[in-house]
Amino acid sequence: MMKRCTIEDNALVCSILGHPSIYPWVTDDSAPPLAFLDYTPFLALDAVYVLMPRPGCLTIFMPINGVTWEVHSAALPESRGDTMMEAAREALAWMFENTPCRKVVTCVPSFNSLALRLAKQIGMVPEGVNRRSFLKDGVIYNQTLLGICKEELLCRQ
């Protein structure tokens, strides 16, 4: 069952996104130290959807405009692989069915091959490269922009 996280779930969200096997992959050099992690401001926004389709799996949708959201996902080690892929597909379908969302995009730094693979597995297609746009450990990386439209997802079901 799909759970939309609220400010009451901040500790749970922080425990997942702050996990040692996740935090280094979902942050850049401007991220706060782990001790200061707090997602309450995001969880309080009506237009931001922090979804937990399966235990240990988070999918965060942030609006770009009235019909397009940017997505990022994270899963605890025991929820990776097929579980995360199914959770991401469920969250994507939920967004298209329950919000005005018509398109979902993501930006994947070139060093994150697992995130790139997940995006492609759920039907997202590469749409371009945002060159030299992600700073991690003092190194600047390109990001691949991927996207999927509501109609494309419906055709795959």
Stretches found by the model and what they are:
Residues T27-V48:
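Active-site rim helix/loop that mediates acceptor-substrate recognition in acyltransferases
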